[in-house]
Amino acid sequence: MARIAGVDLPREKRIEIALTYIFGIGLSRSKQILRDTGVDPNKRVKDLTDDEVAKIRDYIDKNFKVEGELRAEIARNIKRLIDIRCYRGLRHLRGLPVRGQRTRTNARTRKGPRKTVGVMRKKS
């Protein structure tokens, strides 16, 4: 099993698809990596030579932030927005949509499950 950027790539999948299992690499970036390293995108991960795996690994390490490094940068950026108390930072802080979506209805992904509001009744 090929291990690139701390991720075990699935052996049976094509390398083009398998690279997308790495956080920060989508299909278009995967195609770019394979084009620049000269590896056939239709090759299965199990059929890659050690040299090809090393070439891909080195290319990714030199050119992209992926996995933990990318997650840390995203977290730092969000923390910076919160620290400077800008509008986007406050939206992150309150767990509301950041990019201008409506909140009167919908926005359930950011707000979480509904909080049921109960009504107190008089005893009769």
From Swiss-Prot:
Located at the top of the head of the 30S subunit, it contacts several helices of the 16S rRNA. In the 70S ribosome it contacts the 23S rRNA (bridge B1a) and protein L5 of the 50S subunit (bridge B1b), connecting the 2 subunits; these bridges are implicated in subunit movement. Contacts the tRNAs in the A and P-sites. PANTHER family: 30S RIBOSOMAL PROTEIN S13/40S RIBOSOMAL PROTEIN S18, SMALL RIBOSOMAL SUBUNIT PROTEIN US13M. Belongs to the universal ribosomal protein uS13 family. HAMAP family: Ribosomal_uS13. GO terms for biological process: translation. It comes from the Bacteria. Part of the 30S ribosomal subunit. Forms a loose heterodimer with protein S19. Forms two bridges to the 50S subunit in the 70S ribosome. Keywords: Ribonucleoprotein, Ribosomal protein, RNA-binding, rRNA-binding, tRNA-binding. Signal peptide: none annotated. This is Small ribosomal subunit protein uS13. InterPro entries: Rbsml_uS13_C, Ribosomal_uS13, Ribosomal_uS13-like_H2TH, Ribosomal_uS13_bac-type, Ribosomal_uS13_CS. Residues 99-124 are annotated as: Disordered. Pfam families: Ribosomal_S13 (PF00416). Residues 101-124 have a biased composition (Basic residues). GO terms for cellular component: cytosol; small ribosomal subunit. GO terms for molecular function: rRNA binding; structural constituent of ribosome; tRNA binding.
